[in-house]
Regions:
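Patatin-like phospholipase
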Residues: 2-83, 93-382
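Catalytic nucleophile loop
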Residues: 89
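Catalytic nucleophile serine of serine hydrolases
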Residues: 86
Length: 382
């Protein structure tokens, strides 16, 4: 006899199928926790364990650096899992490497060295030399003749001489990848997009490498695809910004802090050719993330019935969208050191305010409803 198929069953099957496309492999369902367990799940006495989801966004990753610095400064918070894409992947790998090497202070120092290295790379710094970091953040690169000329040429990376001398590679050689592969204390996932098949590949502690990080941050309009195992890879944000489900599979019932740097809203519709292109990329990078969270939201509706493979995940978001949505989109490509320091301070202040207001919720409840996080059109269709 065929049992009754309800809309809830269809929704759950749809969501799990969609998550499968994102690289999620179904784990045994997690029983419904008691109220006491729900309040203390994943938290040792006196400690609050969190997982982090770090978005990509070029120089905006310095905002995430500031958030991480504040979290590392809190002796009651343990970071036990990280998923990141592009700049978020770089932040995540440097963070976890530092934690494994010597704890929070080592991680803070490693992140500062990394971002100081980013600021020391060639860029448009001479144009901004008389500006504060905030002024630079509000200034479009389109006001720089050299940038405009480069954009006008509209060259493919394959039109230029081949070079393996990516300056980011030198910064990443400080990471001890062998140590990362051997440790299981902190789960780390990074995603990249296969340029040939359009499928997402998720790298974990055990197969992470410099090439995997460069692939995750490989903007196809700027760099040639990074080849790994004979396949070409582009920016992971095309298929997951970041990839959430693979991490939650390993950490059911966790507190997940999403550090969001890509603005959802912009005060005005773009008009220039470059701004139109940049905004379309920004929207597409957010879309896969929203869709994945939407599928998670459907599955998590079944947690009270003991049928969610993720347990009772508690969601939190740290962002400064009201400030960052007013920055020109080209500022993501600006590595001017005072701008990076400004974003760092903005991130640290954001983290400090969030902890003061919401820190007590860790291990107990969500501070962000997915319905509020997702755009209405996404939520209404799940």
């Amino acid at each position: 006899m065929i049992g009754k198929i309800t809309s809830e069953m269809i929704s759950r099957r749809w969501a799990l199928s969609l998550l499968g496309a994102f690289g999620f492999v179904a784990a045994p369902t997690v029983p419904r926790p008691s109220n006491a367990e729900a309040q203390t799940a994943g938290a040792a006495p006196g400690r609050r364990k969190v997982a982090l989801a770090l978005q990509g966004g070029g120089s905006y990753g310095a905002f995430t650096w500031g958030v991480l610095d504040r979290l590392l400064d809190d002796a009651t918070i343990d970071i036990v899992g990280v998923t990141g894409t592009s700049a978020g992947a770089m932040n995540g790998a440097v963070l976890v490497d530092g934690l494994v090497r010597g704890g929070p202070e080592q991680a803070r120092a490693a992140l500062r060295r990394y971002w100081e290295g980013v600021g020391a790379m060639p860029g448009f710094g001479s144009f901004f030399s008389n500006m504060s970091g905030e002024e630079a953040a509000r200034t479009s690169l389109e006001s720089i003749p050299a940038y405009v000329e480069a954009v006008k040429k509209n060259l493919s990376p394959y039109d230029l001489p081949a070079s393996n001398d990516n300056p980011m590679r030198r910064l990443l050689t400080e990471i001890d990848f062998e140590r990362l592969r051997l440790q299981d204390e902190i789960q780390l996932t990074v995603c990249a997009t296969n340029a040939r098949t359009a499928r997402r590949r998720v790298f974990t502690n055990h197969d992470l490498s410099v090439d995997a990080l460069l692939a995750s941050a490989c903007l196809p309009q700027l760099f040639r695809a990074v080849e790994i195992d004979g396949e070409p890879y582009w920016d992971g944000a095309l298929t997951g910004n970041p990839a959430v489900a693979p991490l939650l599979t390993k950490m059911p019932g966790c507190d997940l802090i999403i550090v969001r740097v890509d603005p959802v809203n912009r005060p005005e519709a773009p008009r220039s050719v470059r701004d139109i292109y940049n905004r379309s990329v920004e929207i597409s990078h957010n879309a896969t993330f929203w869709l994945e969270l939407g599928a998670l939201a459907v599955v998590l509706r079944f947690v009270d019935e003991g049928r969610s493979p993720f347990g009772r995940v508690r969601f939190h978001v740290m962002e400064a969208s009201s400030v960052m949505e007013r920055f020109p989109m080209s500022s993501k490509l600006n590595n001017y050191p005072p701008l990076l320091e400004y974003l760092f301070n903005l991130g640290r202040q954001t983290g400090d305010a969030w902890i003061a207001q919401n820190g007590d919720a860790l291990g107990r409840r969500s501070t962000m409803d997915l319905q509020q996080l997702l755009p209405g059109s996404i939520w209404n269709n799940i």
